[in-house]
Amino acid sequence: GSLPSFPQATTTFSTPKFISIEGKISNEKVKLTWNISENETADKFEVEKSSDGGNFSLAALVFGTDKMSSDQYQFYEKVNSGKILYRIKLINKNKELEYSKIIEINAGA
C-alpha cells in the first residue's frame, strides 16, 4: 500500500509595518508618535537618535503590545538645542527588522 497524502500546511506570518511616524517639540521635550499595522507580530521598537545623520545610538526601548491589528506608540525625551534626527527600528517576533523614515527635530538655540 501507499501512504495517505495530506495537504501541506503553510503558515503565513504577517509582518508589522509603519503606517505613520511624526515628531514634535514642545516645552523642550520631543514627542515621537508612530502607528503600525499587524501590531500583534511586533516584538519591540528601538528608538535611535543621531546628531549627524550617520551614527545612530539607542535612545529608548519600547516593547510592543499584544493588541490585534494596529496600535500607536509614543516616546518623550527632554532635549537641549540643536538638530536631532530620530528613527525607529521595528523588530518583529521573527527577529526581522524594519526602519522608519528619519524624523528631524530642530530644538531652539
Predicted regions and their residues:
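Short, compositionally biased serine/threonine- and acidic-rich segments at solvent-exposed termini, linkers
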Residues: 1-109
